[in-house]
A protein has these predicted regions:
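Conserved alpha/beta-hydrolase
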Residues: 108-130
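Alpha/beta-hydrolase active-site loop
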Residues: 135-156
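Short beta-strand/loop motif that positions the catalytic acidic residue
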Residues: 269-271, 276-278, 282
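Short alpha-helix in the alpha/beta-hydrolase fold that links the catalytic acid
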Residues: 272, 286-295
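An N-terminal hydrophobic leader/cap segment in hydrolases
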Residues: 1-69, 344, 353-356
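The serine-hydrolase catalytic nucleophile loop
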Residues: 97-110
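Hydrolase active-site cap/lid region
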Residues: 180-256
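Catalytic histidine-centered segment of alpha/beta-hydrolase-like enzymes
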Residues: 309-323
Length: 359
């Protein structure tokens, strides 16, 4: 009808690409706008899934964290918020590697329903709709934590309540990274078994790589090279296979991208109260790793070393004592009692500590 001149074609093609890009950006916001206009930009409540009974409301949430630190593109993650009108604060639970929001639902038992709202959510590449996403063991998961925390900060029923983080393993590291990047994200944190660097996690796993000959045990040749180049994309598949075999660290079930991350350094930016918990018998994260993270924290801090038998076992080894300690810390924060206490300290359970609390 109106034929283009040959010289105009490249410009028109560029214009078409720009329009397509803008449409893709706006398409991200369409679900949020259709779902709940009164919610915030970090996510929205799926109204048809909301349930309420006896003063308790359960909301299913769709979160929209950034895909990466250098991209404005968003991904979708799923969460579940259980809230009460009488709650004094909100807890954001950050799960560990190979878990999801339903696996950690049992942790809601730690927090009294009428006292705390609790939100669980799926980290990227975990749980619902994780296809095409990659786990980075805390680096990009910090963006998931930020989106979830900001959603709660802007929730109309929760925005005036303190927000606390509870994270274990990878979830604890992700919370550290998020808080170090945004100092007003949380009011306090409980961090169970965080590692001090991704390099140390890989190193501990590869230390199990040994061979035996004539009754003697030797380091398997090539172990140092695997450790040195563990973050290289061409080496990661081999590293994952080795870690699965020798260290029971199965990174093959979740799309994973090992990335350099240093929570012990990031912890130096944290000034809010932090309660660290760790098992003395943890074979994946050593006690000195957690001490390194603890020593870096700049605000009120406590470290409790338990007799748990393995990685993230403090809760399961002695649930009564664990629940008591966690509740006590959060109540001290809520009641403003920490200012009059020593600002740091390490408590270690006796080796002969009885299994049952109070025994």
């Amino acid at each position: 009808m109106f034929p283009y001149k040959k010289a105009q074609v490249p410009a028109i093609m560029r214009l078409n690409r720009c329009v397509a890009m803008l449409l893709s950006m706006f398409s991200f916001w369409i679900p949020a706008l259709n779902g709940a206009m009164d919610n915030n930009l970090y996510g929205y409540i799926i109204p048809e899934k909301t349930k309420a009974a006896d003063g308790i409301v359960v909301e299913h949430v769709l979160l929209y964290p950034q895909e990466s630190h250098d991209s404005l593109k968003r991904i979708a993650r799923h969460g579940m918020l259980v809230r009460s009108d009488d709650a004094k604060a909100t807890i954001l639970v950050c799960h560990g590697f190979m878990c999801d929001k339903y696996d950690v639902g049992v942790l809601r038992r730690i927090f009294k329903t009428k006292q705390f709202n609790v939100m669980t959510f799926d980290f990227r590449a975990h749980g619902q709709d994780g296809e095409g996403q990659y786990c980075t063991f805390g680096r990009d998961e910090a963006l998931d934590v930020t989106a979830a925390a900001q959603f709660l900060r802007n929730h109309p029923e929760l925005c005036d309540k303190p927000l606390f983080a509870y994270g274990f393993s990878m979830g604890a590291v992700s919370a550290i990274e998020a808080q170090s990047q945004s100092s007003e994200l949380f009011d306090a944190m409980i961090l169970d078994c965080p590692f001090d660097s991704s390099e140390r996690v890989i190193k501990m796993g590869l230390e199990c790589l040994k061979c035996s000959m004539f009754g003697y045990e030797f380091d398997l040749p090539g172990r140092d090279l695997l450790q040195k180049y563990a973050f290289h994309p061409y080496i990661q598949a081999l590293v994952k296979a080795v870690l699965k075999t020798v260290a029971q660290l199965d990174a093959t079930g979740v799309s994973t991208n090992f990335c350099p991350i240093y929570p012990a350094e990031s912890a130096k930016m944290i000034t809010i109260p932090v309660f660290f918990i760790h098992c003395k018998n943890d074979q994946k994260v050593s006690v000195d790793q957690v001490r390194n993270v603890y020593e870096g924290a700049a605000g009120y801090k406590r470290l409790w070393l338990t007799n748990g038998r393995r990685h993230y076992d403090s809760f399961f080894y002695n649930p009564e004592k664990y629940i008591e300690q966690v509740r006590q810390f959060y109540n001290q924060v809520l009641n403003g009692e920490l200012e009059g206490l020593p600002q740091e300290g390490i408590v270690e359970d006796d080796d002969e500590d009885e299994h049952l609390f109070g025994a």
